[in-house]
Every structure is written in C-alpha cells, then in structure tokens.
Amino acid sequence: MANHKSSLKRIRQEEKRRLHNRYYAKTMRNTVKKLRATTDKAEAVAMYPGVQKMLDKLAKTNIIHKNKAANLKSKLAAYISKLA
C-alpha cells in the first residue's frame, strides 16, 4: 500500500483512467463488430464515417495505437467495398 499522499492520488487517477479507457475500448470493439456483422452495403456505408471518427478520436487520445486505428479503418473499408 502506498504511504505518500501523492502516490495515493496517483493510484486513484490511474484507476479512474483505466476504467475510462476500458469503456471506450469496449465501445469501439462493439461498434466494429456491429459494422462487420452488417450485410447491407447502404447501412454499412452509413455507419462507416461514425466508426472512422471514433477510431481517430481513440487514437488521438492514446486509448488505441494510431497504427491499430489505421489498420482497422483500412480493413473495414475493404470489407464495405466487397459487400454486394
């Protein structure tokens, strides 16, 4: 257990940040799964800008790595283009 006031505060901050990051990472994963489950091209095209925006914001705030965001966006765009 931490003994210093500052280290106790750091523990509180890290826990709060961890929960915040977990929430947004899970939300991102669910949104990507929902887009991948879509078989209708029009619906997928409508969803894609929102997913892309979410990935960019999460990469900007270091919740996910920028390369992971780029890879996901690329794969989702390829998936949408293959839909009939």
From Swiss-Prot:
Residue stretches spanning the membrane: none
State the Gene Ontology terms under molecular function.
small ribosomal subunit rRNA binding; structural constituent of ribosome
- Gene Ontology annotations of biological process type: translation
**Is Cell division there in the keyword field?**
no
UniProt cross-references to InterPro entries, sorted A to Z: Ribosomal_bS20, Ribosomal_bS20_sf
Q: One Pfam family from the UniProt entry?
A: Ribosomal_S20p
Superkingdom of origin = Bacteria
Q: Which UniProt keywords apply?
A: Ribonucleoprotein, Ribosomal protein, RNA-binding, rRNA-binding
Q: Does the keyword RNA-binding apply?
A: yes
What does the entry list under GO cellular component?
cytosol; small ribosomal subunit
**Protein's job:** Binds directly to 16S ribosomal RNA.
Q: Which family does it belong to?
A: Belongs to the bacterial ribosomal protein bS20 family.
Q: Check the record and name the NCBIfam families matching this protein.
A: S20
Which HAMAP family does the UniProt record give? Ribosomal_bS20
Q: What is this protein called?
A: Small ribosomal subunit protein bS20
| Organism encoding this protein | Phocaeicola vulgatus (strain ATCC 8482 / DSM 1447 / JCM 5826 / CCUG 4940 / NBRC 14291 / NCTC 11154) (Bacteroides vulgatus)
